[in-house]
């Protein structure tokens, strides 16, 4: 149970980090949040 939660959290953080990097490079201010 804890193992699955750990992997889910790790995957979520990893995906979020990738998304932030991609938005930071491709957005260039066009996607202004």
Curated annotation (Swiss-Prot):
<keyword id="KW-0472">Membrane</keyword>
<keyword id="KW-0812">Transmembrane</keyword>
<keyword id="KW-0249">Electron transport</keyword>
<keyword id="KW-0793">Thylakoid</keyword>
<keyword id="KW-1133">Transmembrane helix</keyword>
<keyword id="KW-0602">Photosynthesis</keyword>
<dbReference type="GO" id="GO:0017004">
    <property type="term" value="P:cytochrome complex assembly"/>
</dbReference>
<feature type="transmembrane region" description="Helical">
    <location>
        <begin position="2"/>
        <end position="22"/>
    </location>
</feature>
<protein>
    <recommendedName>
        <fullName>Cytochrome b6-f complex subunit 8</fullName>
    </recommendedName>
</protein>
<dbReference type="InterPro" id="IPR036143">
    <property type="entry name" value="Cytochr_b6-f_cplx_su8_sf"/>
</dbReference>
<dbReference type="GO" id="GO:0031676">
    <property type="term" value="C:plasma membrane-derived thylakoid membrane"/>
</dbReference>
<comment type="function">
    <text>Component of the cytochrome b6-f complex, which mediates electron transfer between photosystem II (PSII) and photosystem I (PSI), cyclic electron flow around PSI, and state transitions.</text>
</comment>
<dbReference type="InterPro" id="IPR005497">
    <property type="entry name" value="Cytochrome_b6-f_cplx_su8"/>
</dbReference>
<dbReference type="GO" id="GO:0009512">
    <property type="term" value="C:cytochrome b6f complex"/>
</dbReference>
<comment type="similarity">
    <text>Belongs to the PetN family.</text>
</comment>
<comment type="subunit">
    <text>The 4 large subunits of the cytochrome b6-f complex are cytochrome b6, subunit IV (17 kDa polypeptide, PetD), cytochrome f and the Rieske protein, while the 4 small subunits are PetG, PetL, PetM and PetN. The complex functions as a dimer.</text>
</comment>
<dbReference type="GO" id="GO:0045158">
    <property type="term" value="F:electron transporter, transferring electrons within cytochrome b6/f complex of photosystem II activity"/>
</dbReference>
<keyword id="KW-0813">Transport</keyword>
<dbReference type="Pfam" id="PF03742">
    <property type="entry name" value="PetN"/>
</dbReference>
<dbReference type="GO" id="GO:0015979">
    <property type="term" value="P:photosynthesis"/>
</dbReference>
């Amino acid at each position: 149970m804890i193992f699955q939660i750990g992997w889910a959290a790790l995957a979520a953080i990893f995906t979020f980090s990738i998304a932030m990097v991609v938005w930071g490079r491709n957005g260039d201010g066009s996607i202004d949040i």
